[in-house]
């Protein structure tokens, strides 16, 4: 393994203040940069490289690697897919590339500034229906190392093309009957007639459950109609991105979200 990755830390509040002052002073929008994934051959040697590899493993195989913190069958890669063995590297599917330079940031859900560590904790509590890792947990540090490696070369505050999940909203209620027909035709083969997903030979979810006790809970971002519709529109069916119309993605999301799932127990600002 070769390459050099320097990790700099600063006070979260100070970093956010400096970023805000810089943006106001220049009176311009943050720059947009291309989504570029580092070559695996450029992983650094030594302890940092080992931490990056562990972080990738935690994000790819989360239930098996961190069973005490995951309450369902989902792994981080199910909402943050990647290619060539990476996680969080695909556009329009909340990629991790550049994410370290966009935190701390204001969270409308919490009504305050939060760190990336806290945002990851949200995902564990909501999307994984589990509990957040302590801020000094070794696995969390490894995940941050992986995200930092993916983000190398991206300026602080820059917007990476394809960041986040583009939301999709139509000015009508979802058509559940149409959504069910589309689900049976385009989704059932992978996710099952009962939405329970498909396991591989090792008992891990090759295709995740979309509802039921092993799926994300009611506090997850994917439980929002606009977010689910946007994800389906841009990333589903697998291998046929953007093959559904806006109307089709909207109705499939509406059908999926009518089904029961674990209840998020904490107060939410969603």
From Swiss-Prot:
Identify the keywords attached in UniProt to this record, alphabetized: Heme, Iron, Metal-binding, Oxidoreductase, Periplasm, Repeat, Signal
PROSITE patterns xrefs: CYTC
Q: What is this protein called?
A: Thiosulfate dehydrogenase
Q: How does activity depend on pH?
A: Optimum pH is 4.2.
Where is heme c 1 annotated to bind? 76, 79-80
Quote the PTM field: Binds 2 heme c groups covalently per subunit.
Q: Which cysteines are cross-linked by disulfides?
A: none
Kindly list any coiled-coil regions of this protein: none
Q: What is its EC number?
A: 1.8.2.2
* Keyword Heme belongs to the record: yes
Named from the GO MF annotations, one term is: thiosulfate dehydrogenase activity
Its domain of life? Bacteria
Q: Name one GO cellular component term.
A: periplasmic space
Lineage, highest ranks first: Bacteria, Pseudomonadati, Pseudomonadota, Gammaproteobacteria, Chromatiales
Localization terms from the record: Periplasm
**Which Gene3D superfamilies would you find in this protein's record?**
Cytochrome c-like domain
Name the InterPro entries for this protein: Cyt_c-like_dom, Cyt_c-like_dom_sf, Cytochrome_c-type_DH
User: What catalytic activity is recorded?
Assistant: 2 thiosulfate + 2 Fe(III)-[cytochrome c] = tetrathionate + 2 Fe(II)-[cytochrome c] + 2 H(+)
């Amino acid at each position: 393994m070769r390459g050099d990755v320097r990790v700099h830390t600063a006070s979260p509040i100070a970093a956010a203040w400096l970023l805000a002052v810089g943006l106001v002073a220049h009176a311009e929008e943050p720059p947009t940069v291309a989504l570029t994934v580092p070559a695996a051959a450029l992983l650094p040697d030594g302890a940092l490289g080992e931490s990056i590899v562990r972080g990738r493993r935690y994000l790819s195989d989360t239930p098996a690697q961190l069973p005490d913190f995951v309450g369902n069958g989902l792994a981080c890669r199910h909402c943050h897919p990647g290619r060539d063995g990476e996680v969080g590297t695909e556009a329009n599917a909340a990629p991790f590339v550049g994410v370290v330079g966009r935190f701390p940031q204001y969270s409308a859900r919490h009504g305050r500034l939060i760190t990336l560590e806290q945002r990851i904790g949200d995902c564990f509590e909501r999307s994984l229906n589990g509990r957040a890792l302590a801020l000094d947990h070794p696995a969390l540090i490894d995940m941050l190392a992986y995200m930092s490696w993916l983000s190398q070369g991206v300026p602080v505050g820059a917007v990476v093309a394809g960041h986040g999940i583009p939301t999709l909203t139509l000015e009508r209620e979802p058509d559940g009957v149409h959504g069910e027909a589309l689900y049976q035709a385009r989704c059932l083969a992978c996710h099952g007639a009962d939405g329970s997903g498909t396991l591989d030979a090792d008992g891990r979810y090759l295709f995740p459950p979309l509802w039921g006790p092993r799926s994300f809970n009611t506090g997850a971002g994917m439980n929002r109609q606009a977010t689910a519709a946007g994800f389906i529109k841009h990333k589903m069916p697998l291998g046929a991105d953007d093959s559904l119309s806006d109307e089709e993605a909207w109705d499939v999301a509406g059908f999926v979200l009518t089904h029961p799932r674990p209840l998020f127990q904490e107060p939410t600002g969603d």
